[in-house]
Amino acid sequence: MGNCLKSPTSDDISLLHESQSDRASFGEGTEPDQEPPPPYQEQVPVPVYHPTPSQTRLATQLTEEEQIRIAQRIGLIQHLPKGVYDPGRDGSEKKIRECVICMMDFVYGDPIRFLPCMHIYHLDCIDDWLMRSFTCPSCMEPVDAALLSSYETN
């Protein structure tokens, strides 16, 4: 096995000795005068919200009214039923097999959310969608109207 990189010193032993002499000149083995680097501090990302489908803003840039509206929307989304995808015993049932938002097949055990129109989506996909537009991506039925009417009948 050869080394394709040319070096002025072709002898591995001489490279090893050079490395040891470099360390000795830097005072290895003694306490360095430098402090160790500060620990890595992970910055918490600022959430990005979509007050309307065409706008994207950081949470810190929203007005109080927009923050209230987003909090209400999140509250409504949390009231939508969620579950786990189960295609059935034989898997041949006429069930939806693909999330139309991400175009990925559902896999047994995937977290899903049910909309009042009976369409299902991956939980993360539909939650993100509903933060932008409160309509079903398949049939365009308003989700909030169906949610509010279901509260009135109970």
UniProtKB/Swiss-Prot annotation:
A lipid is attached at residue 4 (S-palmitoyl cysteine). GO terms for molecular function: DNA binding; ubiquitin protein ligase activity; zinc ion binding. CDD domains: RING-H2_RNF11. Keywords: Cytoplasm, Endosome, Lipoprotein, Metal-binding, Myristate, Nucleus, Palmitate, Phosphoprotein, Ubl conjugation, Ubl conjugation pathway, Zinc, Zinc-finger. The modification Phosphoserine is found at residues 14, 25. The modification Phosphothreonine is found at residue 135. GO terms for biological process: protein autoubiquitination; ubiquitin-dependent protein catabolic process. Residues 41-51 have a biased composition (Low complexity). A motif (PPxY motif) lies at residues 37-40. A zinc finger (RING-type) spans 99-140. Changing residue 12 to A: Loss of GGA1-binding. It is found in: Early endosome; Recycling endosome; Cytoplasm; Nucleus. Residues 1-53 are annotated as: Disordered. InterPro entries: RNF11_RING-H2 (IPR042981), UEC_component (IPR052804), Znf_RING (IPR001841), Znf_RING/FYVE/PHD (IPR013083). Transmembrane segments: none annotated. GO terms for cellular component: early endosome; extracellular exosome; nucleus; recycling endosome; ubiquitin ligase complex. Changing residue 15 to A: Loss of GGA1-binding. Changing residue 103 to L: No effect on UBE2N-binding. No gain of UBE2L3-binding. The PPxY motif mediates interaction with NEDD4. PANTHER family: GEO07743P1 (PTHR46359), RING FINGER PROTEIN 11 (PTHR46359:SF1). Essential component of a ubiquitin-editing protein complex, comprising also TNFAIP3, ITCH and TAX1BP1, that ensures the transient nature of inflammatory signaling pathways. Promotes the association of TNFAIP3 to RIPK1 after TNF stimulation. TNFAIP3 deubiquitinates 'Lys-63' polyubiquitin chains on RIPK1 and catalyzes the formation of 'Lys-48'-polyubiquitin chains. This leads to RIPK1 proteasomal degradation and consequently termination of the TNF- or LPS-mediated activation of NF-kappa-B. Interacts (when phosphorylated) with 14-3-3. Interacts with the E3 ubiquitin-ligases NEDD4, ITCH, SMURF2 and WWP1. Also interacts with the E2 ubiquitin-conjugating enzymes UBE2D1 and UBE2N, but neither with CDC34, nor with UBE2L3. Interacts with ZNF350, EPS15 and STAMBP. After TNF stimulation, interacts with TAX1BP1, TNFAIP3 and RIPK1; these interactions are transient and they are lost after 1 hour of stimulation with TNF. Interacts with GGA1. This is RING finger protein 11. It comes from Homo sapiens. The lineage of its organism: Eukaryota, Metazoa, Chordata, Craniata, Vertebrata. The gene is RNF11.
